[in-house]
């Protein structure tokens, strides 16, 4: 956020979860829009943002779908910083319509293409979009979800400026003994793709 935005800029996180991006935006004097399909995430984010600081940031939180940001006009956002769920790995709701965490990989990528198109629409020309995502393992095989999702953003019109590899410390997504029994290595990294419009 420090690298790709300035005080007073508008930041978007369309998979806001508990509101971490919005908290950072508030602390760094950026305005922010947070969107999540899960009403519980909206409530948690609202609670997490109830702190005082010197910032005069405007923070807007909305229960909605990242594939349809109709309430944001074209080319209004200065920076997108988001971390979508990983196709059917951790379910973030119990059947909320439009929750992409419930989808199989191909359906997930189809929805991420819509997310990429909406991101391109709302972002100002020349501005950056940072998306963090990792690969997944299904039935003992690695699915390169990160790079497949990257293609969605490239097809939407973005240019890839950076690929940052973020190491996951204390990775607990797969139990150590399970890796020993099934003879595979942990996926202990995520990607941060930085795209430019």
Give the residues covered by each predicted segment.
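Class I S-adenosyl-L-methionine-dependent methyltransferase catalytic core
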Residues: 1-197
């Amino acid at each position: 956020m420090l690298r790709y935005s300035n005080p007073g800029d508008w930041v978007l996180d369309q998979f806001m979860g508990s509101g971490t991006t919005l908290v950072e935006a508030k602390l760094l004097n950026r305005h922010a829009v947070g969107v999540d399909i899960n009403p519980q995430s909206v409530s948690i984010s609202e609670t997490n943002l109830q702190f005082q600081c010197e910032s005069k940031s405007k923070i807007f939180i909305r229960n909605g779908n990242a594939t349809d940001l109709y309430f944001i006009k074209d080319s209004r956002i200065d920076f997108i910083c988001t971390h979508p769920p990983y196709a059917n790995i951790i379910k973030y709701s119990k059947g909320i319509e439009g929750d992409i965490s419930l989808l199989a990989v191909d359906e997930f990528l189809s929805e991420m293409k819509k997310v990429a198109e909406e991101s391109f629409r709302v972002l100002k020309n020349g501005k950056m979009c940072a998306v963090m995502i990792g690969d997944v393992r299904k039935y003992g095989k690695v699915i390169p979800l990160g790079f497949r999702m990257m293609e969605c953003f490239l097809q939407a019109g973005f240019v890839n400026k950076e690929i940052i590899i973020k190491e996951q410390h204390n990775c607990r997504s797969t139990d150590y003994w399970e890796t020993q029994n099934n003879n595979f290595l942990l996926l202990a990294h995520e990607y941060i793709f930085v795209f430019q419009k």
